[in-house]
């Protein structure tokens, strides 16, 4: 594949700078999964901040963006926001904003967004206001579902005549769909 190893990860025998790599510890190979088209997307745990000494966020997001483009699958960065629990203030929130903006700038077509770990950090009492801050700064508009161009989706036509009867939902759609 010619992919260089990302910071914080090893691939095909390259040494990991920090943490561990699932290939050699739990025998999972997510790059093989997207290469072989067995999965539609990956959500790598990109749990480091931009200021991390050996595994800064930027080079990792760039590496996974290259992998997503090369293998034609989506990758959603799983960002940790648990560090916010140590200091609930907007200067710490700005690191999350930087990561979202880096993801958007590095997209290369197949990196359509991010997800956060953990919901306790997002909605818990320690980080009250984070969700509102993100809505104000980077999530002002609804997101569209990214196209999975590798599927040939049928044209299902417009749904009409939607009815709910008890627990049964029915509708009229294009015939033979």
Go through each PLM region and give its residues.
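Surface-exposed substrate-engagement region within the catalytic domains
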Residues: 50-109
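Aromatic- and acid-rich polysaccharide-binding/catalytic face
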Residues: 20-54
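C-terminal active-site rim and adjoining tail of enzyme catalytic domains
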Residues: 88-147
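Solvent-exposed loop/turn segments at secondary-structure junctions
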Residues: 2-6, 47-52, 81-85, 119-123
């Amino acid at each position: 594949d010619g992919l260089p190893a990302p910071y914080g990860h090893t691939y095909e025998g390259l040494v990991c700078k920090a943490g561990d790599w699932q290939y050699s510890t739990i025998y999972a190979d997510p790059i093989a999964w997207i290469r072989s088209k067995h999965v539609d997307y990956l959500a790598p745990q990109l749990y480091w901040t931009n200021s991390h000494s050996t595994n800064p966020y930027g080079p990792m997001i760039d590496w996974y963006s290259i992998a997503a483009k090369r293998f034609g699958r989506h990758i959603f960065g799983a960002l940790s926001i648990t560090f916010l629990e140590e200091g609930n203030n907007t200067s710490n929130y700005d690191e999350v904003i930087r990561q979202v903006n880096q993801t958007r700038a590095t997209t290369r077509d197949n990196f359509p967004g991010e997800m956060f770990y953990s919901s306790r950090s997002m909605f818990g009492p320690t980080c009250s206001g984070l969700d509102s801050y993100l809505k104000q700064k980077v999530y002002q508009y609804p997101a569209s579902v990214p196209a999975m161009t590798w599927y040939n989706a049928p044209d299902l036509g417009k749904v009409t005549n939607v009815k709910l009867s008890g627990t049964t939902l029915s509708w009229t759609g294009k015939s033979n769909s």
